[in-house]
Regions:
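Noncatalytic, solvent-exposed loop/strand surfaces
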Residues: 1-179
């Protein structure tokens, strides 16, 4: 997958679980890399030094994640394979504290591909409607109203997803028997 890069504003960095030196570095560009070993790594682009502890999610990530286009400290990343942790799914991660705010897509009964639920694509977020758009290899396009609440002054961030629309699409790889 592709790494993500972000130069966080000082106010945002102050609320993050970054190492103190990273919070203080004015020109820090943080590289965020979800890897095949189940970890998400956080690095200084200039030096390669870790900016915070890695986040273990326990799934293989082989596609590109996405950062929220509004500058909110949110990462959207989907697992590319099942693991000992369960069936592959999408993670919505709070980058202030590296907590998982929401997951979806695993074992979706709406899928044409049974329990297969890989998510190698990168997410889109419609900033105007606060809607996450995420295609899955399970043959479902997810449109999820996030109801994001972000207060940079207080350093708080949450999502309360509702109004989930699932659009089923058909193709060579969307049915169990045809792949």
């Amino acid at each position: 997958g592709q790494p993500l890069m972000m130069k966080w504003p000082k106010k945002v960095k102050k609320a993050m679980n970054m190492y103190d030196w990273a919070k203080e570095k004015d020109d820090l560009v943080e590289v965020i890399y979800a890897c095949m070993d189940g970890y998400v790594y956080f690095l200084d682009l200039e030096t390669g030094e870790a900016t915070r502890d890695p986040l273990y999610l326990g799934f293989t990530f082989k596609g590109a994640g996405a950062l929220d286009p509004r500058g909110y400290p949110i990462m959207y990343v989907g697992a590319g394979y099942d693991s000992n942790e369960g069936t592959a799914r999408v993670f919505v991660v709070n980058l202030l504290d590296c907590s998982v705010m929401y997951t979806f897509g695993n074992n979706d009964e709406f899928s044409l591909r049974g329990n297969l639920s890989y998510f190698d694509s990168s997410a889109l977020v419609d900033a105007a409607t606060d809607t996450l758009i995420y295609p899955g290899e399970n043959g479902i396009l997810y449109l999820i109203k996030l109801n994001t609440s972000y207060d940079p002054e207080a350093g708080t961030l949450s999502v309360n997803p509702d109004h989930i629309v699932k659009w089923r699409y058909y193709g060579t790889r969307t049915r169990v028997g045809s792949y």
